[in-house]
A protein has these predicted regions:
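C-terminal boundary/linker of central alpha/beta nucleotide-binding cores
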Residues: 1-24, 36-39
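Residues that cap or initiate secondary-structure elements
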Residues: 17-19, 27-29, 155, 164
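Short, glycine- and charge-enriched coil/turn segments that flank and shape catalytic ligand pockets
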Residues: 6, 28-32, 134-140
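Active-site micro-motifs of SAM-dependent methyltransferase domains
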Residues: 19, 76, 131
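Internal alpha-solenoid helical repeat scaffolds
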Residues: 96-179
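Residue-level detector of family-conserved "landmark" positions at structurally sensitive sites
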Residues: 3-4, 55, 68, 169
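Extended alpha-helical scaffolding segments used for macromolecular assembly and cargo binding
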Residues: 26-116, 121-125
Length: 179
């Protein structure tokens, strides 16, 4: 066991010992019991601000609702901090029917593809956002999320050499951004 901090609260097991413990856990508990442990770990990590670990445990528990909520909250900041592969792994693990309903997850997919220069791959997500924002909602989408969507669309049009079209996306966008 190796200490990870000066206070003696965090320790790391040798990787072989950790593997032994994981094997014993899997051999002594049912799959459902292991899933419950992963759910508890996910919630603990979330409460302690360790979102990467929380998402990984939520996915290991097959708790896609918790994983999707956590990804919605953290995907964009992580993409902007160059953690694209981690976010991509998470996004691919979330069922497609959940992706289709989540503006934030679609936004993450769009940004991830745009930042990689994969414009055609971003288009389905940008188009889905247009559809999601057009639907009547009991809770309207936040103005900032819609403004971000407009920014993505403008970036896409600019990259296609259409600056005039990017300025004309939404006449109310400029007013909304100022309010």
């Amino acid at each position: 066991i190796s200490p990870l901090d000066d206070e003696g609260q965090w320790f790391r097991y040798h990787h072989l010992f950790a593997d032994l413990l994981k094997t014993r856990l899997q051999n002594s508990l049912t799959k459902a019991d292991v899933q419950v442990l992963h759910q508890r770990a996910a919630r603990w990590y979330e409460q302690n601000g360790m979102i990467v670990e929380a998402v990984d445990h939520a996915l290991a528990a097959a708790d896609h609702h918790l994983a999707a909520r956590l990804v919605e909250e953290t995907a964009l900041p992580m993409i902007l901090q160059a953690h694209v592969r981690t976010v991509e792994r998470w996004l691919q693990a979330i069922p497609s029917e959940m992706v289709e309903k989540s503006p934030k997850i679609n936004m993450a997919y769009a940004w991830m593809n745009l930042l990689r220069g994969m414009l055609p791959a971003a288009m389905p997500f940008i188009d889905r956002l247009r559809i999601l924002f057009a639907q009547p909602q009991t809770d309207p989408w936040s103005i900032s999320l819609q403004a971000e969507w407009l920014a993505i669309r403008a970036e896409l049009l600019m990259s296609q050499g259409k600056p005039a079209e990017s300025r004309d996306l939404d006449p109310g966008a400029e007013a909304a951004a100022r309010s």
